[in-house]
């Protein structure tokens, strides 16, 4: 019987050594001519991360952008990004999941810079890959429960192991969360169920998984910025400006299939397929105007009913190693097909009313309604995108590696809205997307690299008054260095410049968010990331980034900074592990700080969200029983700093507060 080799992430505590999706081969990070950062499972566990926001606070150059009232993942990478921009992958595949981090998550990888050659339609800022847990052939399990200082708590069960007498292994993960929202009303309710099954053959491994998640979460756009006063309106941060019916209710699902077959010791063929859905309904009392003299707030009740998104992604890869011309070649070739469909059925817009006053907050003066706006309903978009690609990593000698690759991408896009339906986009095209990079390994633990790559992304346009929008196109140059230091510490330094043309942004036109396109924007920056072990007791993950993202060509915004892009971001989290104590138990302490400088709150730069620094801390005690039990306390925003995590970018009426001080206490048992 042959030996099955399952490639993947090797890590030691906080130190990542490999990130196979970044090259779609099992390449060491030192051999990749691109900045790749990994937040390991150990970091996620120590920080008790609850979302991608928590995880990505450890990575340089990433800030939050418009999250649609806290209902979507939305991140800026190297100056570029928005919600629903296809940048967040699950196991290297595109999905339509609104929030990709959950109980199935094992680690998170960030591939900086253009990823279009390997992952298709992408921004030049990079891609975020959530890697999920898989069935294992050795039995293990974990059960945990936690409580929040906000009120309420959560629970999780994760069990995996072999099925006796077969070549099968299973994994079953379930979780439930029901916690109070930190502002004056609202609850976060979520549940998840995820079974998976793997079959291990002589040369083949097949894994199928299913995840279904239900959610009912606050739709909270934050507060108003008073530009004349130079700050937020004078209202306690816990007081909301909307109504208790501001809720998004929905469910999402993800079905995946992975087949990996070893053709020979050097060659492997892999097939991946994912099918994802997200269906939701939301209601909101949207702020439309504010009178600073009287404190009166004009609101409009809006709703989306019958919103549905579907995504299919299929990929076939052939990877292998060959010797040609006396040199080693790590080869990748493949084909991919992506399908994405969005339908928002009933768009409800009620009459505006002066229905709130910040001097006398009261709720209930407005109710939901059923006033469907025919011209804005049935928003529909469909994107089909087949492609083929090739990559060759050529090892010229023991020190030099040259990586060259290209993708030929086709696309067909239609979109429109209204009853009767008005088609405003019907476009198709193709694009050749290349990238070239080189690595110089000065020593076995030090490498220097350079790369140049293009990116390409057709634009979502059912909310555009312009009709067909030209695809966004980007070009990035990057140089950098990587180190693997003694005791298990990894570091990387990157310097880059990226130009993007035909960039979309959003404007509030009489209460309707319209999509528009700028001419050209440019982002330049420096990034530094460090993670791993300093000593046998100390582990650390740290980052710093300088990002200068400005509009270079546009009728209105030339010279303006891009909204929500901070020039400086920094983070540090350090953990001290006391090891095994005299009584046989374990104990560790950790603390860290996350800092973000001021950044524009709106496209015209008429106001800036202030910078902030937030301190976190944790302690964990493990009882060395037959089934180890760990009790963990995590403190976030230890000094209760008031800060803003992001803004709408299109108006001053949506500025999201960051969470105040909160504590979570959890207990987990492993078996």
Where are these regions (language model features)?
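Acidic, small-polar-rich N-terminal luminal/periplasmic segments of exported/outer-membrane proteins
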Residues: 2-138, 479
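Gram-negative outer-membrane beta-barrel transporters
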Residues: 497-499, 517-602
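Surface-exposed extracellular loop regions of Gram-negative outer-membrane beta-barrel proteins
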Residues: 214-230, 341-343, 435-478, 483, ...
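Acidic/polar loop-and-plug regions of large Gram-negative outer-membrane beta-barrel proteins
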Residues: 177-181, 194-262, 275-309, 352-381, ...
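Structural signature of Gram-negative outer-membrane beta-barrels, strongest in the C-terminal barrel
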Residues: 198-200, 309, 328-330, 336-340, ...
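Outer-membrane beta-barrel translocator/receptor signature
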Residues: 104-106, 117-195, 199-205, 253, ...
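Membrane-embedded beta-barrel scaffold of Gram-negative outer-membrane proteins
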Residues: 260-274, 278-284, 441, 447-449, ...
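Conserved C-terminal beta-signal and adjacent last beta-strands/turns
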Residues: 331, 450, 477, 563-671
């Amino acid at each position: 019987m042959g030996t099955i080799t399952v490639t993947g992430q090797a890590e030691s505590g906080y130190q990542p050594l490999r990130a196979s999706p970044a090259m779609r081969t099992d390449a060491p990070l030192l051999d990749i001519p691109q900045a790749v950062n990994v937040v390991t499972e150990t970091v996620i566990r120590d920080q008790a991360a609850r979302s991608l926001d928590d995880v990505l606070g450890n990575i340089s150059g990433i800030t939050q952008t418009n999250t649609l009232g806290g209902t979507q993942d939305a991140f800026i990478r190297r100056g570029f990004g928005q919600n629903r921009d296809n940048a967040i992958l699950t196991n290297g595949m595109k999905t339509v999941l609104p929030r990709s981090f959950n109980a199935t998550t094992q680690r998170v990888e960030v591939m900086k810079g253009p990823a279009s050659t390997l992952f298709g339609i992408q921004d030049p800022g990079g891609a975020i890959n959530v890697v999920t847990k898989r069935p294992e052939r050795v039995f293990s399990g974990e059960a945990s429960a936690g409580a929040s200082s906000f009120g309420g708590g959560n629970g999780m069960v994760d069990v995996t192991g072999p099925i006796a007498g077969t070549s099968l292994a299973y994994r079953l993960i379930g979780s439930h969360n029901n916690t109070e929202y930190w502002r004056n009303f609202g609850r976060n309710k979520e549940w998840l169920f995820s079974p998976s099954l793997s079959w291990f053959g002589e040369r083949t491994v097949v894994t199928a998984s299913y995840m279904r998640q239900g959610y009912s979460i606050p739709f909270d756009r934050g507060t108003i910025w008073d530009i004349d006063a130079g700050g937020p309106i004078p209202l306690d941060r816990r007081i909301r400006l909307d109504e208790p019916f501001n809720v998004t209710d929905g469910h999402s699902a993800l079905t995946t299939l992975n087949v990996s077959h070893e053709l020979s010791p050097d060659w492997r063929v892999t097939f991946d397929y994912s099918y994802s859905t997200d269906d939701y309904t939301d209601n909101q009392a949207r702020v439309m105007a504010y009178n600073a003299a009287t404190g009166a707030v004009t609101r409009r009740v809006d709703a989306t009913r019958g919103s549905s998104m579907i995504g299919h992604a299929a990929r076939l890869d052939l990877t292998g190693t060959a010797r040609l011309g006396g040199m080693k070649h790590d080869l990748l070739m493949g084909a991919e097909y992506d399908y994405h469909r969005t339908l928002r059925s009933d768009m409800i817009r009620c009459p505006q009313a002066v229905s709130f006053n910040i001097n006398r907050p009261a709720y209930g003066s407005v109710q939901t309604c059923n006033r469907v706006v025919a011209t804005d309903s049935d928003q529909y978009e469909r994107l089909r995108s087949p492609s083929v690609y090739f990559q060759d990593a050529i090892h010229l000698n023991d020190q030099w590696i040259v990586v060259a690759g290209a993708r030929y991408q086709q696309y067909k896009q239609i979109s429109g809205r209204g009853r009767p339906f008005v088609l405003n986009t019907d476009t198709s095209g193709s694009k050749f997307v290349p990238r070239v990079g080189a690595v110089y390994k000065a020593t076995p633990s030090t490498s220097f690299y350079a790369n140049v790559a293009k990116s390409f992304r057709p634009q979502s346009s059912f909310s555009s008054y312009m009709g067909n929008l030209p695809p966004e196109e980007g070009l990035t140059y990057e140089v950098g260095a990587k180190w693997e230091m003694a005791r298990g510490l990894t570091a990387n330094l990157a310097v880059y410049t990226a130009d993007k043309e035909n960039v979309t942004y959003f404007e509030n036109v009489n209460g309707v968010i319209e999509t528009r396109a700028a001419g050209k924007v440019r982002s330049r920056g420096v990034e530094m990331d460090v993670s791993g072990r300093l000593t046998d007791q100390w582990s650390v993950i740290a980052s710093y980034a300088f990002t200068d993202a400005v509009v270079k060509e546009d009728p209105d915004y030339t010279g303006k900074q891009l909204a929500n892009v901070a020039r400086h971001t920094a983070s540090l989290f350090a953990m001290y592990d006391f090891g095994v104590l005299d009584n046989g138990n374990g104990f560790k302490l950790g603390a860290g700080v996350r800092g973000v400088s001021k950044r524009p709150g709106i496209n015209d730069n008429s106001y800036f969200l202030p910078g902030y620094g937030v301190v976190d801390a944790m302690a964990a005690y493990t009882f060395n029983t037959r089934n180890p039990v760990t009790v963990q306390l995590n403190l976030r925003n230890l000094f209760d700093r008031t800060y803003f995590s992001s803004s709408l970018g299109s108006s001053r009426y949506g500025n999201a507060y960051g969470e105040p001080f909160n504590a979570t206490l959890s207990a987990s048992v492993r078996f």
